[in-house]
Amino acid sequence: MTLLEISHHPLLPGSHCKGFFFHSGSMKLRSIKLSLVCEEQATYRQGTDMRFESHRAFKQEISVLDRHHLQSDQGLEHEFNFSIPESAMHSFRSEHNQVQWKLVVQIKPESLPRFKRSFLIIVHPGHHRREES
């Protein structure tokens, strides 16, 4: 089981946030990587086919836990911090386009293929400050 919590909401461009990660299970782990990711996605028609394009616009590694940190029979608890970039595009969804922010946990077990868990987060539009003259 993999759980992830963030300290507050809404998230805005330039905001800082604390997070909490918990993973339990009986498998031995090599590593766990936690990343903040933004993906842009578009759906369009080409002839009679529907096409889906996805582009990773941003990725930042937040934490890497290796074997040294993963020697627990209980469960793994980990606190972390992350920031939404000041210039970040807010989350967005329309019929054919979307901008999606998420926290991605990549787990690499000792003897099984690696797997990922994604946790969507919503970034609200920032408040633009007007320059005073």
Predicted regions and their residues:
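C-terminal beta-sandwich interaction modules and adjacent acidic
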Residues: M1-S133
